Amino acid sequence: MLREELNEKDTWDLTTIFANNEEFEKAFNNANIEIENIKKYENIMINSSDELYQTTKTIYEVGEKIDRIYTYANLKYSEDTSNNDSQTLMGRAQELYKKFSEATVFYDTKLISLDEETFEKYISENKNLREYEIVLRNAYKYKPHTLSDAEEKLLAAFQKERGTASDIYETFTASDLTFGKIKDENGKEVELTDTNYSLYMKSQNPEVRKSAFKTLYKTYEQYQNTFASIYAGQIEVEKTCAKVRGYKSAMEAALFADDVTPEVYDNIVNSISNHLDVLFKYYRMKKRVLGLNDMHIYDVYVPLISNFERNYTYDEAVNEVLEATHIFGDEYVNILKQGYKDRWVDVYPNKGKRGGAFSGGCATTNPFILLNFQGTEYDVSTLAHESGHSMHSYFTRKNNPLQYADYRIFVAEVPSTVNELVLAYYRLEHTENKLEKLSILNSLLELYKATIYRQIMFAEFEKTTHELSEKGEVLTAELLNKEYYEINEKYFGGEIILDKEISYEWMRIPHFYYNFYVYKYAIGLTGASKIVKRIRAKEPHALEDYFEFLKIGNKKNPIESLKVAGVDFTNTNVFDSAIQIFDELIDEFEKLYKEL
């Protein structure tokens, strides 16, 4: 379907950002002028607390105008990436953003050049400046890790090269690897790719699963030394950069921005290690349901039950999400309902439209949602998920000034996952169809297994490999394969036959090049589980705590923000609620399955 063939009510209303092209061009031209005016602050910024306030205030105000322009261009481009006008618009917005970044590059350097006594004096003496205290402290905290101007320029010159290992990995895996052919369920010879591999791992035919598994990893085995060199190079660069900047480790450097300590990271990994018995219970149940005497590692992705698929109209999806979120009260539902009515959502696929789904916007726009809705249960869950992001953005922006009207990636997946969970519970409670219930339970079980256990397994491997490197160990393919196999032994606990090829799986995980990122996936589901458990149990202040969390923005760091919602990642029992839910879901699935 072409963009112009869509019904207007099913598209997002971007006229709420700019009513027409003239408005956009006026804003664009004014922004260019204001960017030039920022440059005058460079030499006076730290002369007094008032100059620091004026500089900071101006940068945030101009930055928001740039964000508004960029948001408009990005959303126009996303709705039809093949449209020449939208391509041009996007290019112009990107150049404007680059110009703004270059014009403000002096800010952090100047701020950090203040001695601590003067920095504290400026904040204490200036009431207006104290409105920006948290963002100022977030920038100033890098002072001990900032080098001289000459050294910083030298490091900046190598910034592109810092991503070389990741670039090589991406190019090599996307363009150069081939995996040969396998026979599918119908005996037809098909080309195996890294993309369709996951489909064959869910095949009901064990020979197809085995063939896909063995064939894929045969290729990775051939290039194991190359992958080891790439990954070791990535770790070496991050280790060196951390050392140069005065961090104790690459882990400490990577976690520093979110105010997360290595101790908190270790607590997260260790907490899951204390709950592996529930994961083993899941695999034992899966083995029984699938009727397998022996369960190989290539059997773990087979669905417990073929998905029960309902078809939804978009209106039905909206109604189901609104009904499910009634658990949060009328205020939440009424705002979301009005958002749908006010065309926050771009609903259907069209030619040239960006794939997938996202929630996007900035502090002065609506929290728009892009979907590619085709009526599946997954699409309804996606609507709930993205609506969770958008409602988080709505409450954050409505309750904070510009400088705090956003939130960090660390907490971003919590409200979206909360919505996914309440939708799943709503569905379970409002259907009598046992197959549908089993399908929902199967999806939830896979969600917990993949998002908590698997991601933390990756996080543990990443921690181990960095520690080995920092001890002076050479990260050979043999060593990496051994460490990865042993971590798999720990997480599969003798319940699964670990074919030797699983040793090579670390080679196909791109997240290891994101530098201590994977643990954040577990944060979202763990936090959401605790919040939903509290709300469903009608714990005192559970709803109030959740709304306070939604409204807090960047006024607190991520760990402290989640504490407001009743989730404490410094506590060793932080995963208890999520694991308890996982445990209960296993029991519920098996009990219901026996009733078929």
What are these regions (language model features)?
Residues E4-L6, Y107-L114, N126, I134-K141, ...:
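C-terminal, non-catalytic "cap/extension" segments appended to globular domains
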Residues M285, V289-I327, V333-N334, H392, ...:
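Long, K/E/R/D-enriched contiguous segments that form extended
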Residues E309-Y314, T364-A384:
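Short pre-active-site segment immediately N-terminal to the catalytic Zn-binding motif
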Residues R310-Y312, V345-T365:
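Catalytic zinc-binding patch centered on the HExxH motif and its immediate surroundings
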Residues Q403-P415, L447, A477, Y514-Y521:
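Active-site metal-coordination segments of metallo-dependent hydrolases
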